[in-house]
């Protein structure tokens, strides 16, 4: 059974707020989020499913992804979003948000907070990825560390 990209997008959209997305059409949102998919796939290097088995025209993976796999992929997409929109862009230094609810008093402090948030997301997702890898090893009957014996002197 196939997994549509839309499942990833739905999971991802609930994790962040963007001022641009409400102004976009559904197709524009899909195109925008699709840009974060390929880097997310390359980061998910221990996936037990073949993430390259996909149809970009039909916007789906040709395999069924579990909820954990969808969560890991959408988290990596979120990290890619933060990287591209905030971390790797010089426009961060020219922040002009019209919202009266959110004011930036120090761009340097704001950047520090963004970097801390980014690091937190990466750490949390790497932990989830490690658990996913361990679950796969356990399900496969692989005994990690088996066969290695310390010699006593």
Where are the regions a protein language model picked out?
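Divalent metal-cofactor coordination and adjacent catalytic microenvironments
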Residues: 31-108
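Conserved short "hinge" loops at termini or chain/domain junctions
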Residues: 1-65, 127-134, 139-153
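Polybasic, proline/glycine-rich intrinsically disordered low-complexity segments
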Residues: 105-138
């Amino acid at each position: 059974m196939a997994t549509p990209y839309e499942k990833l997008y739905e999971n991802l959209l609930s994790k962040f707020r963007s001022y641009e997305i409400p102004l976009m059409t559904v197709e524009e949102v899909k195109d925008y989020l699709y840009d974060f998919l390929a880097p997310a796939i390359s980061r998910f290097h221990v996936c037990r499913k073949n993430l390259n088995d996909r149809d970009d025209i039909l916007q789906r993976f040709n395999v069924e992804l579990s909820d954990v796999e969808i969560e890991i992929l959408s988290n990596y997409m979120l990290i890619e979003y933060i990287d591209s929109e905030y971390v790797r862009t010089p426009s961060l230094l020219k922040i002009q948000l019209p919202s009266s609810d959110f004011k930036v008093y120090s761009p340097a402090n704001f950047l520090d907070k963004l970097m801390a948030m980014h690091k937190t997301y990466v750490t949390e997702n790497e932990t989830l990825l490690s658990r996913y890898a361990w679950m796969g090893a356990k399900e496969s009957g692989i005994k990690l560390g088996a066969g290695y014996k310390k010699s006593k002197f």
